Amino acid sequence: ATPCYAWALIPNHFHLLIRTGLVPVATVMRRLLTGHAIRFNHRHQRSGHLFQNRYKSILCQEDPYFLELVRYIHLNPIRAGLVADLHSLDRYAYSGHSRVMGKLKGDFQDIKTVLSMFGETRREARKRYNAFVFKGFLAGKRPELTGGGLIRSSGGWHAIKEFRRMGAHFKSDERLLG
């Protein structure tokens, strides 16, 4: 099994936070995207590709970036203008936030792991998780979260600038989270 900790469906893309396991990410994504395309095409009596480009992935070490990714992914529907606020997000069917908050059910998402990082009981954990997400909502875009996996895994912008000063060059995907 491939645990999913956070997800959000947006009209033109989606986000998943999954743990790699015995099955490579490429295989998981191929199965997911192909299966979805087949079902979608059948339901809408159409054929062809649904997605324009290959998926993008970044490597995430669990501490501390894991929780930042959970928050970023679950706030995506607000940033995309699909819901107005956190109260609406609590019941938004196309994001894992509603499952973590216990407002909607779904057995494919591992909410226990996420909640365990916020408290001993589900009630306490949900309260602290919601406060954490709200804090991210209030913060808006955060410059310290700029950059793809390379920047975070290399020790941040300071380390990257030092590497560049020494003449090192990297290929990376720059992204803004926040």
Which residues fall in each region the model found?
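Short Pro-Cys-Gly-centered "Cys-loop" motif that presents a nucleophilic cysteine in a tight turn
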Residues: 1-11, 19-178
